[in-house]
Amino acid sequence: AKTSHANYSFMMGGTNDNLEEILKINPKNVAGIKLFLGSSTGNMLVDNPETLEKIFSSTKMLIAVHCEDEATIKANLEKHIEEYGDDIPVNKHHLIRSEEACYLSSSKAIELAQKTGARLHIFHVSTAKETELFTNKIPLENKKITAEVCVHHLWFTDKDYDTRGNLIKWNPAVKTQT
């Protein structure tokens, strides 16, 4: 749009296969780079450690990540498929896309950002455990690692799957109340 009542921009989506495109980005044309560290949307997964390190070390743009550990999710999913087949109850979603999957992935992303000096923003923090990875001892203007939480992760718990079912099934999953 030539005019807008809102300030908007788009992120460039990263994959295991588009590193060269990411490295060519003009930072004036995008808000940052969005990476899915756990499979969630189409082929937007970035789980190749070499690709991740190259992205983190090669750009000054904001790197925004959806943090879920793919190996943990796959192992949890296999366990639930063994028990339920292809008809896994929705109230098991938080056990597949678990607290540990989120914590492991967020930990790795933060470690990589600290190692490379990258600007990192973690989307959709969904566990209290993940919040322990962040500090409020740094003035906001000096922070290079930030995060956000979605309201639904604050409002709903795993107990709500029984009454709301797929209406509250998203990634990262709604978790157990702390």
Q: Language-model segments: which ranges?
A:
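Histidine/acidic residue-rich metal-binding segments in metalloenzymes
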Residues: 20-35, 41-178
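Metal-cofactor-binding active-site regions of metalloenzymes
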Residues: 1-20, 37-40
